[in-house]
UniProtKB/Swiss-Prot annotation:
One of its GO terms (cellular component) is cytosol. This is Homeodomain-interacting protein kinase 1. Belongs to the protein kinase superfamily. CMGC Ser/Thr protein kinase family. HIPK subfamily. Residues 902-926 are annotated as: SUMO interaction motifs (SIM). Ubiquitously expressed, with high levels in reproductive tissues. Expressed in the epithelial layer of mammary gland, uterus and epididymis, in the corpus luteum, and in post-meiotic round spermatids. There is a cross-link at residues 25, 120, 124, 991 (Glycyl lysine isopeptide (Lys-Gly) (interchain with G-Cter in SUMO2)). It catalyses: L-seryl-[protein] + ATP = O-phospho-L-seryl-[protein] + ADP + H(+); L-threonyl-[protein] + ATP = O-phospho-L-threonyl-[protein] + ADP + H(+). The keyword Protease does not apply. Its EC number is 2.7.11.1. The keyword Cell membrane does not apply. One of its GO terms (biological process) is regulation of tumor necrosis factor-mediated signaling pathway. It is an enzyme of class 2 (transferase). It comes from Mus musculus. Interacts with Nkx1-2, Nkx2-5, MYB, PARK7, DAXX and p53/TP53. Part of a cytoplasmic complex made of HIPK1, DAB2IP and MAP3K5 in response to TNF. This complex formation promotes MAP3K5-JNK activation and subsequent apoptosis.
Length: 1210
């Protein structure tokens, strides 16, 4: 059938880097483009046709317009025979022509010069629909009867008069922009430089902010009453999002909102190009998976944040995904356009949402919906990137659901029966058997509605699995081709989960981020593939560089909200990795209570979203601005700042003593509002408590580190309120920040004052409120508090890499989570309480029939902390509900049998003279001392401690380590005059799920008995034991084994493991599961797994990272909701040269519980003299490890595992 396209006037084109729009006045009734003829032709590249007409006499020629400064060429890839090109207008014949009284306006969404085949000759991609006279022709409503007056200068088209009011409803309320017009807000003025684009909301202009000389994009909403309500919703959502880190969560940053001539103006950062224009620029060629992956990861991160806030974007499509800077930051994207967004609680099932190509089935069928519709849209987007063509380019909702049903099958019967719009597209025939619903034929639908069905698909798939066969690259071979096929399998698997018709079964953003396609764990089977290395390198863009954010302009924005009301002082902080900067400027906290706003500029170089280590990737020359947002109020007052001059590796904010006195769980704060992103709201445990409340904001730091909550009590005889403050155990610059270091800050603080250290890694649990999770606190004897001043807690760790899990993703919890004390959230919480010896601490463990010593007792919350208990690796217990005496009846270790999640409490009384005779004598009498570590905090015992009970290690191993820098354990030579020591034990309870079989994990080992060591194995662990010499590889037989593989399942060929596990039957119970879902580190070592026999990180060779140019690492994104992801660190602590290693991987279920692991410093390694640079910053444990056993080479990386959501790392 011949088709004709008659153009009545030249097109009006609007274009810029932000977005572009173009209008063509056509007579749309008489043309039809059908791909079903035998002589199919495709649009060709042509710039010679006149701009006023274009006639296609026989087949599919379309006019191409010769417009300067615009790319007119669109070469349609023609090799696919599946695709069918159809018309956007009714092709029923002349009847449709007679019905049209006026010409319509076809508006393309980009600056292409013809009705490109991507839109199927006019198939609309926008959500606006005009369904009259059987034709679907309007892509986007515009005021269109009057063309814009344009001025073309060289290659730049600028707008002099953008819009002319007309009778069209879409033209009502548009603001008439004039070039170089000044838009004024309360605090800034903006000069209009260029028109960027228009939508149903209004228009976007490129403007110049005169005060800062930066380019911004201003969205000018229509003042029509029909847009007023949605404009208010958008402003409120942007106001909420402005309190989050826009760079971290990958959505456009909004600066301010103001009114200009009765039009609402929203000021945004200027972004370069949307994904649709990017596809068009590349002639709609398919995008390789290695480029789709970083885009998917970043958008899924944004959706995860929106889900945690209870927000629905509701218009996710390539046009609303912007490339930030395609040249300097390739494939760095942000999500824009929250004009259709809404809160999930206000979602109405009849609401018309989403652009049609990306519309979820629940919207089409009229079902209740939630934020899962955004995941459907994202699936359609990544499918479009993969195909170069929309997966479901429906010209109408009927075509849309028809395409979906043909490829993925009909929606379930219960969905169709519940849908309010089901009968528009389906017929229910009670005479038929199952299924009860039948999709209407195109003829039936056209007869009922007058809307003719179109075929606009380029690819018609019988199932989504068929997508893996298209667009296969021809330049790959060998392992590269195998890796590409494996990558496609994981991509299709993820795509099917994202395009699940049932929204309740659709994958969530968090699970998407932990899918193997994103974490790339499946690519570890191809270590020598250059294609795989390229994939890892492309994901580097997800590592973000953060520098000082312009908080001044942010404060002026009406979007910026403060936790505290107006105070006399604002203290704006961003953070570095050196605490001495805080020391040098700590006087600001004390002196600026009435001064102007003080700023501690401690900008950090690297904040890794995907947890790349800063040692591996250099900082960018063009860093992305960081965000300092909502704050916490610090009560001004006299301070006694610690005066140590040595730089700590951890960043802390040292708060004055009077700080706690003003802490209330209300918004009535005064003093220093510290602006931060995503801090942890800590809510009081009891009315007597005065905790620190931190609203949502972030203390952005270069690394995301685990938390520890430490509490200091003043020296009073009665119980006092507890002030829980997160302690972080890592630092940003690849250096170990152990509690020994951080606790030394407490040395200079007087004993009778309350001091708090605020770390900089509060982004670990954004949005999670620890309401009643503050458990009974640990008691440090006054002897240590007064004489030692915690001096032994700190070692001189001035070097080394940081071993910590990365937790930087947002929380999934929309509101605060109230946790009862009996059901603690495993957040790695340990309370350290200093009291006088005369004080008594009533504790809940009295209910467990265990007396509490008033002298010194210790309670440790169930936190995922590596417990090093001196020379006795078997003294701690968390996985067993057993009551085993340690010293005598007065010295029990109590594991209370509370409901899951249990609170594992270990109480070890200090040694007193009257208890000397009742203690068990150690088997090794030569061992006189031990050091207990609370997250590597060394606390010395009395000389005749029983810690050597069941210790298979000689005494000289302790002294051998004392000389090493960074050693935690004390030797036996410590005099007995050290006084009473405190034994501090952290017990992490958890269980790990192996496939569908859940087994209890012995996180800290079995309880030791009087005579023999007891080995505990986690999963199939080879059991690296905790000894005074660090972690020691299992030597065999009955060696004491205590794997610290808290959430991993180690695999090894050690046969003694199973022997010990079978020889030590003990009652075991399932502990509270903490799902470590988020991390997935990867390290490549260029070479065969057989090339080396020792662990690459334990080799005494030169530094591993600097000497490995082919080392590519990538860590999966995490979220605070999946904080639990401890490193599988056992194999790092085996002796150097040992041929055994614990290559571990984990199979994690989808259960989500918060958990915070604790980092490991290099001092715990077998040899502290090994250069810390030999170890990767955060996740160096999962490289291909050479082994003397060929059968265990690939145990660390199972071939295409199905449920592995992370690889642990350090």
């Amino acid at each position: 059938m011949a088709s004709q396209l008659q153009v009545f006037s030249p097109p009006s084109v609007s274009s810029s880097a932000f977005c572009s729009a173009k209008k063509l006045k056509i007579e749309p009734s008489g043309w039809d483009v059908s791909g079903q003829s035998s002589n199919d032709k495709y649009y060709t590249h042509s710039k010679t046709l006149p701009a006023t007409q274009g006639q296609a006499s026989s087949s599919h020629q379309v006019a191409n317009f010769n417009l300067p400064a615009y790319d007119q060429g669109l070469l349609l890839p023609a090799p696919a025979v599946e695709h069918i090109v159809v018309t956007a207008a009714d092709s029923s014949g002349s009847a449709a022509t007679a019905t049209f009284q006026s010409s319509q306006t076809l508006t393309h969404r980009s600056n292409v010069s013809l009705l490109e085949p991507y839109q199927k000759c006019g198939l609309k991609r926008k959500s606006e629909e005009v369904e009259s006279n059987g034709s679907v022709q309007i892509i986007e409503e515009h005021p269109p009867l009057m063309l814009q007056n344009r001025t073309v200068v060289g290659a730049a088209a600028t707008t002099t008069t953008v819009t002319t009011k007309s009778s069209s409803s879409s033209g009502e309320g548009d603001y008439q922009l004039v070039q170089h017009e000044i838009l004024c807000s309360m605090t800034n003025s903006y000069e209009v430089l260029e028109f960027l684009g228009r939508g149903t909301f209004g228009q976007v202009a490129k403007c110049w902010k005169r005060s800062t000389k930066e380019i911004v994009a201003i969205k000018i909403l229509k003042n029509h009453p029909s847009y007023a309500r949605q404009g208010q919703i958008e402003v409120s959502i942007l106001s909420r999002l402005s309190s989050e880190n826009a760079d971290e969560y990958n959505f456009v940053r909004s600066y301010e909102c103001f009114q200009h001539k009765n039009h609402t103006c929203l000021v945004f950062e200027m972004l370069e190009q949307n994904l649709y224009d990017f596809l068009k620029q590349n002639k709609f060629s398919p995008l390789p998976l290695k480029y789709i992956r970083p885009i998917l990861q970043q958008v899924a991160t944004a959706l995860m944040k929106l889900k945690s806030l209870g927000l629905i974007h509701a218009d996710l499509k390539p046009e609303n995904i912007m490339l930030v800077d395609p040249v300097r930051q390739p494939y760095r994207v942000k999500v824009i356009d929250f004009g259709s967004a809404s809160h999930v609680s206000k979602a109405v099932c009849s609401t018309y949402l989403q652009s049609r190509y990306y519309r979820a089935p629940e919207i089409i069928l009229g079902l209740p919906f939630c934020e899962a519709i955004d995941m459907w849209s994202l699936g359609c987007v990544i499918a479009e990137l993969f195909l170069g063509w929309p997966l479901y380019p429906g010209a109408s909702e009927y075509d849309q659901i028809r395409y979906i049903s043909q490829t993925q099958g009909l929606p379930a019967e219960y969905l169709l029966s519940a849908g309010t719009k089901t009968t528009r597209f389906f017929n229910r025939d009670p005479n038929l058997g199952y299924p009860l619903w039948r999709l209407k034929t195109p003829e039936e639908h056209e007869l009922e509605t007058g809307i003719k069905s179109k075929e606009a698909r380029k690819y018609i798939f019988n199932c989504l699995d068929d997508m893996a066969q298209v667009n296969m690259s021809t330049d790959l071979e060998g392992t590269d081709m195998l890796a590409e096929k494996a990558d496609r399998r994981e991509y299709i698997d993820l795509l099917k989960k994202m395009l699940t018709i049932d929204a309740d079964k659709r994958i969530t953003p968090l699970k998407t981020l932990n899918h193997q396609f994103v974490t790339m764990s499946h690519l570890l089977d191809f270590p020598h593939s250059s294609h795989v290395k390229s994939c890892f390198q492309n994901m580097e863009i997800c590592k973000r560089r953060v520098h000082m954010y312009d908080t001044v302009s942010q404060i002026k924005s009406p979007f910026t909200t403060h936790v505290a009301p107006n105070t006399s002082t604002n203290l704006t902080m961003s953070f570095s990795n050196q605490l001495n900067t805080v020391h040098n400027q700590a006087s600001v906290l004390a002196s600026s209570s009435t001064a102007a706003a003080a700023t501690l500029s401690l900008a950090n170089s690297d904040v890794s979203l995907l947890n790349y280590q800063s040692a591996l990737y250099p900082s960018s020359a063009a860093p992305v601005p960081g965000v300092a947002q909502q704050g916490v109020s610090l009560q001004p007052g006299t301070t006694q700042i610690c005066t140590q001059t040595d730089p700590f590796q951890q960043t802390f904010i040292v708060c004055p003593p009077a700080f706690q006195t003003g802490l209330q769980a209300t918004t009535k704060h005064s003093g220093f509002p510290v602006r931060m992103d995503n801090a942890v709201p800590i809510v009081p445990q009891a009315p007597a408590a005065q905790p620190l409340q931190i609203q949502s904001g972030v203390l952005t730091q270069g690394s995301c580190t685990p938390l520890m909550v430490a509490t200091l009590h003043p020296q009073v005889a009665t119980i006092t309120p507890q002030y829980a403050v997160p302690f972080t155990l890592s630092c940003a610059a690849g250096r170990p920040a152990l509690v020994e270091q951080t606790a030394a800050v407490l040395q200079a603080w007087p004993g009778g004052t309350q001091q708090i250290l605020l770390p900089s890694a509060w982004q670990q649990l954004p949005g999670v409120a620890l309401h009643n999770s503050v458990q009974p606190a640990a008691v440090i004897p006054e002897a240590m508090g007064s004489s030692q001043q915690l001096a032994d807690w700190r070692n001189a760790h001035s070097h080394g890499n940081q071993y910590s899990t990365i937790m930087q993703q947002p929380s999934l919890l929309t509101n605060h989570v109230t946790l009862a004390t009996a059901q603690p959230l495993n957040v790695g919480v340990a309370h350290v309480v200093r009291q006088q010896q005369s004080s008594s601490l009533p504790s809940k463990k009295n209910k467990q029939s265990a007396p509490v010593s008033s002298k010194s007792s210790l309670e440790v919350l169930p936190s995922q902390v590596y417990s090093l208990v001196g020379s006795s690796p078997l003294r701690t217990t968390s996985s067993y509900n057993s009551l085993v005496p340690v010293q005598d009846q007065h010295q029990p270790i109590i594991i209370p049998d509370t409901p899951s999640p249990p609170v594992s409490v270990i109480t070890i009384r200090s040694d007193t003279d009257e208890e000397e005779d009742n203690k068990y004598k150690p088997n090794s009498s030569s061992l006189k001392a031990r050091s207990n570590v609370i997250s590597y905090v060394t606390v010395n015992d009395s000389p005749d401690s029983d810690s050597s009970l069941s210790s298979p290690h000689p005494t000289d191993t302790l002294s051998a380590l004392r000389g090493n820098s960074g050693t935690l354990l004390e030797g036996p030579g410590r005099p007995a005059a050290d006084g009473i020591g405190t034994r501090t034990i952290i017990v992490p309870p958890l269980k790990t799920q192996l496939g569908d079989c859940t087994v209890a994990t012995q996180a800290s080992g079995l309880l030791s008995s009087k005579t023999k060591p007891v080995a505990s194995v986690s999963g199939q662990s080879s059991g690296c034991c905790i000894t005074p010499t660090g972690y020691r590889a299992q030597r065999g037989g009955a060696s004491a084994v205590q794997p610290l593989n808290l959430s991993q399942n180690q695999q090894s060929s050690s046969a003694s493991t199973s022997q010990e596990r079978s020889s030590n039957p003990a009652p075991r119970r399932q502990q509270a599961f903490v799902a470590p879902l988020s991390q997935a580190p990867y390290a490549f070592q260029h070479g065969s797994p057989l090339h080396s026999t020792g662990h690459p990180h334990l080799a005494p060779a030169p530094a591993h990272l600097p000497s490995q140019p082919h080392l590519y690492t990538y860590a999966a994104p995490t979220s605070a909701a999946a904080l639990g992801s401890t490193s599988s660190i056992a194999h790092l602590f085996s002796p150097q040269g040992s041929s055994r290693h614990a290559a571990a991987y984990t199979t994690h279920p989808s259960t989500l519980v918060h958990q915070v692991p604790v980092s490991v410093g290099p001092s715990l390694l077998t040899s502290a003299s090994v250069a810390p640079a030999q170890y990767q910053h955060q996740f160096a444990t999962q490289s291909y490890i050479g082994s003397s056993r060929g059968s265990t080479i690939y145990t660390g990386y199972p071939l295409s595992p199905t449920k592995i959501s992370q690889y642990s790392y350090l």
